[in-house]
Regions:
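Short connector loops/turns at beta-strand edges and beta->alpha or beta->beta junctions
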Residues: 29, 196-198, 227
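Short small-residue beta-strand/loop micro-motif enriched in glycine and branched aliphatics
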Residues: 41-42, 169, 199-203, 233
Length: 434
């Protein structure tokens, strides 16, 4: 079976990493990989993960109880939901509980309108001007080009390669093309995505989740450009500590959970009607369900990546370690033979540091809580955030950037509110972004 050959490859990778770490004086690869990160060490990480587990476990238990009760109404003999069926039951629950089908909002998110909305949102939030550029030579005719300005000062150039085609990478990513050097070289970057559309007559109707992904990736691009104005290329934004790099883009996601921001561009591709508030409310409530369970799942992946890089690779039982963590963090029934670790590609790029997604979610929500919910894009927080967090790039430690914007150490308050939003019957606050 393929997973067995992947096991050999993974064991060889872990062995080589351990050898390198020990040559450099570290006990494990995880100690080496975290030494110059915000988290500092595996010991500090384990302490932090305990805090996240404490915050998310109780609401995750409530989510699972509701989901199991719903499933048992349809299958009375069911005692535990299988890991293989979990996503199915979650989708059925959202449809029944919130009367929301993810397909119902797609007509309000044609690709061209979403692109305009993303650009307009970033422009207003960061006090910049993003202007289309014509006549630029690109690697494919479908690629569009924009220059980013601060007043009359050009900050950099971005390329959007947004639709699938033969031979193209199938993922969604941000690619820095040129690092900025103040006074000598402007930063350039590209989004390489696979969103619907791109063909004549195809409006490219997008799922809401795709709309959020677009803004997330655009957040990386803005970090690269705005943070690429420093004296040295090594101070570019993406050279900040690796366990901070997802925080700015995850923070930006939250703006597209606001009705005022969405309604500024979410118009029906045929009638031009604005996304109905009632449909948004159902979508928003459905979106809150499963957050805590999702965070427990992130803890599972974090624990696996950490254990794989701290336990001796020669005797490491991949299935046993994965199953032990699965049973610790997942309420679902384990499926023997799933071998998820054998296709866990983050073990290659992130190695022991998958925790980045968990840490940065907490920081991102703390950041977002500093914005006025009644005027998300128009208040002073956007420019202050740009100057304190994005513009410095890697000239300062990430922890200092966080403190400079928050005025304090980060905490879990906003994260806890985010986890519990599904149990809050209060109506959703909307900004005046329109």
């Amino acid at each position: 079976m393929l997973f067995r050959s992947n096991a050999d490859t993974l064991r060889a990778l872990l062995t080589a990493r351990l050898e390198l770490a020990q040559l450099l004086g570290f006990a494990t690869w995880a100690d080496f990989a975290m030494a110059d990160m915000m988290i500092g060490s595996p010991a500090h990480l384990r302490e932090y993960l305990q805090q996240i587990d404490t915050a998310s476990r109780e609401p995750a238990t409530r989510e699972q109880a509701a989901l199991l009760a719903f499933a048992r109404e349809r299958e009375p003999a069911l005692t535990q939901i299988s890991a293989a069926d979990s996503r199915y039951w979650q989708e059925q629950y959202r449809r029944a509980k919130y009367s929301f089908d993810s397909q119902s909002v797609r007509p309000y998110f044609p690709y061209a309108a979403v692109e305009r909305g993303v650009i307009a949102t970033a422009s207003r939030l960061f006090h910049i001007d993003i202007r289309p550029v014509s006549g630029v030579r690109t690697w494919h005719p479908s690629v569009t080009t924009y220059d980013v300005y601060d007043g009359d000062l050009r900050l950099g150039r971005i390329y959007l390669d947004m639709h699938p085609r033969a031979g193209k990478d199938k993922w969604f990513s941000t690619a820095p093309l040129t690092l900025g050097v103040h006074g000598r070289q402007l930063p350039e970057g590209a989004l390489v995505c696979n969103f619907p559309g791109g063909a004549a007559g195809d409006p490219g109707l997008m799922q809401y989740s795709d709309v959020v992904i677009f803004l997330h990736e655009f957040g990386h691009l803005m970090h690269h450009v705005i943070g690429g104005q420093n004296p040295y290329a090594g101070q570019a934004a993406f050279n900040v500590e690796g366990d901070f790099v997802e925080a700015p883009s995850q923070m930006l996601e939250e703006f597209f959970r606001d009705y005022g921001v969405l309604a500024s561009f979410a118009h029906h591709y045929q009638s031009g009607a604005v996304l109905p508030r009632e449909l948004y409310e159902r979508m928003s409530r459905a979106d809150t369900f499963g957050r805590a369970s999702g965070q427990q799942r992130q803890l599972l992946y974090t624990a696996v990546s950490l254990d794989f890089h701290t336990l001796p690779p020669a005797t490491l039982d991949f299935d046993a370690v994965f199953r032990g963590n699965f049973e610790r963090f997942s309420p679902n029934a384990y499926v023997p033979g799933m071998h998820m670790w054998a296709s866990f590609t983050h073990l290659n790029g992130y190695s022991s540091n998958y925790y980045t997604y968990v840490l940065d979610k907490v920081i991102a929500l703390d950041f977002f809580a500093q914005f006025d919910p009644h005027d998300l894009l128009g208040g002073p927080a956007g420019l202050r955030y740009r100057r304190a967090v994005l513009a410095p790039g890697a000239t300062q430690p990430a922890a200092q950037l966080v403190r400079d914007f928050l005025g304090r150490e980060p905490n879990l308050d906003a994260y806890r509110r985010w986890l519990l939003a599904q149990f809050d019957s209060a109506s959703t606050i909307s900004s005046t972004a329109r």
